[in-house]
Design a protein with these regions (language model features):
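S-adenosyl-L-methionine-dependent methyltransferase catalytic core, i.e., the SAM/SAH-binding region
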Residues: 1-173
Length: 173
């Protein structure tokens, strides 16, 4: 198998890169879709194999520089769409046949360590927490919702057992 260890030197690399590459077998060539591009770890590893083509999506505008760099390196073999993966059907042509589709769900270190993004609990700052194309920040939600709504958000969307105490403390501030 090809050595893909250089893709682990990225500012953020996918934790399961080896396993995904082994599973999707890009050494055979093919068409791939990366629905959560991020810094391009999976996409670039796949494109390092000849006869591969990748269409990538990411809703996060902060990844555009990574996508531009990948486009420079792989040209027509790479296509990027700044879209949510829920819009995949609008982005992919009906006759496109993917050999493998990747979804690496969750937050990335790119988002956590950029303090302006408001995902970290380790620093004071605006609570933004937008993954990408949203117009409403977490700060907006906190400032506009009532105590009951905030408790429900924490309980049902955050699976937080202590939602009442947390919501009360947020409202106090």
């Amino acid at each position: 198998m090809k050595d893909i260890s250089s893709f682990k030197n990225l500012s953020h690399y996918p934790v399961m890169l080896d396993q995904v590459i082994e599973l999707c077998s890009p050494e055979k060539g093919g068409h791939f879709i990366d629905c959560t591009f991020g810094s391009g770890g999976y996409t670039n590893a796949i494109l390092s194999f000849s006869n591969t083509r990748v269409i990538s999506l990411d809703r996060d505008k902060y990844v555009l520089n990574y996508a531009s760099e990948t486009k420079r390196n792989y040209k027509e073999r790479f296509t990027f769409h700044n879209e949510k993966f829920s819009n995949l059907d609008k982005v992919i042509k009906k006759d496109f046949k993917a050999d493998f589709i990747i979804f690496d769900l969750g937050i990335s270190s790119l988002q956590i360590f950029n303090l302006d993004r408001g995902f970290s609990f380790n620093a004071k700052g605006k609570v933004d927490m937008r993954m990408g194309l949203n117009s409403v920040s977490a700060q907006d939600v906190l400032n506009k919702c009532d105590l009951k709504t905030l408790k429900n958000i924490l309980r049902y969307f955050g699976d937080e057992k202590d939602s009442s105490r947390i919501a009360n403390n947020i409202v106090k501030e």
